[in-house]
């Protein structure tokens, strides 16, 4: 089993949200994806993150009431087509999972570790969805950095940050391989200077 898992990871690629199919994710798979997503390094077992699921009509409603309206406020001269495109971004996938980093004050556990734990949730959700055969991509885009969008998703302004949106859907084509860094460019073996 572990050899199969390593083979999967060595070939893993994301299908872009703009090319995926808005196929639904069945509830058993979704439950497993979320369960895997929460089995991450979490110093102190603080669970310093929230997971918000947008599926079905919620994708359209959130786009209409929040993404489109906010984009129009930020870009008052944008043409209708561009606003419509932004409003419908969540419809590219069958489900969109938002992960919010929600750090808490702690004497021993640094903020950075809590934020890394939230990023690990995103990565685990991405990997588990892909391992089940779904197309999946982890994105941020402009709305991940917008406080009003954060608040609309239940985040606390000045404390929380959106770690990412994981788009999950179907695929009709396997994604193309992209250039990966060469190991000798990114890996070093430390040794004491003589």
Q: Where are the regions that the model predicts?
A:
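Helix-biased detector of long, well-ordered alpha-helical tracts
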Residues: 102-107, 190-194
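N-terminal amphipathic, basic helical "cap/leader" segment at the start of enzyme domains
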Residues: 1-92, 194
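C-terminal helix-cap and adjacent tail motif
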Residues: 4-11, 16, 158-194
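Short Asp/Glu-rich motifs
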Residues: 56, 148-149, 155-156
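Small-aliphatic-rich amphipathic alpha-helix that forms the alpha element of a beta-alpha
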Residues: 37, 97, 103-151
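Structural motif
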Residues: 94-97, 164
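Short, hinge-like loop/turn segments at secondary-structure boundaries
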Residues: 69-70, 155-157
């Amino acid at each position: 089993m572990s050899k199969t898992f390593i083979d999967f990871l060595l070939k893993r690629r994301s299908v872009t949200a703009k090319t995926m199919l808005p196929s639904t994710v069945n509830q058993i798979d979704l439950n497993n994806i979320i369960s895997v997503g929460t089995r991450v390094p979490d110093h102190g077992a603080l669970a310093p993150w929230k997971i918000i699921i947008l599926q079905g009509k919620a994708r359209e409603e959130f786009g209409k009431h929040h993404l489109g309206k906010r984009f129009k406020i930020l870009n008052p001269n944008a043409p209708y087509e561009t606003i419509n495109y932004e409003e419908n971004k969540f419809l590219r996938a069958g489900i969109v999972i938002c992960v919010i980093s929600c750090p808490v004050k702690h004497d021993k556990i640094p903020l950075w570790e809590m934020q890394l734990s939230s990023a690990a949730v995103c990565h685990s959700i991405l990997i588990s969805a892909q391992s089940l055969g779904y197309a999946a991509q982890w994105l941020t885009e402009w709305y991940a950095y917008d406080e009003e969008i954060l608040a609309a998703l239940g985040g606390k302004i000045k404390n929380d940050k959106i770690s990412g949106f994981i788009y999950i859907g179907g695929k009709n084509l396997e994604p193309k391989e992209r250039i990966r860094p060469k190991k000798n460019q990114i890996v070093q073996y430390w040794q004491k200077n003589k």
